[in-house]
Amino acid sequence: MKDKDLLKLLLQNGWKDVRQRGSHHRLKKDNQVEVIAVHGKDVPIGLLNAILKRTELK
């Protein structure tokens, strides 16, 4: 999965982009914070699974 697609998925599921510095987006939902780096590449499968698990999308 591309990092842009992951960012889009999180935004569609209620996460808000509260801050961006360079290519790093800080997303927030219900006192949870997740940082997604958007470099135009595929997200490694282990990192993708960890992010999806922490954001309760998996």
Predicted regions and their residues:
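C-terminal structural segments of small proteins and small subunits
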Residues: 4, 12-16, 28-58
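Cytochrome P450 catalytic-core helices
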Residues: 22
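Short aromatic-glycine-enriched beta-strand elements
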Residues: 25
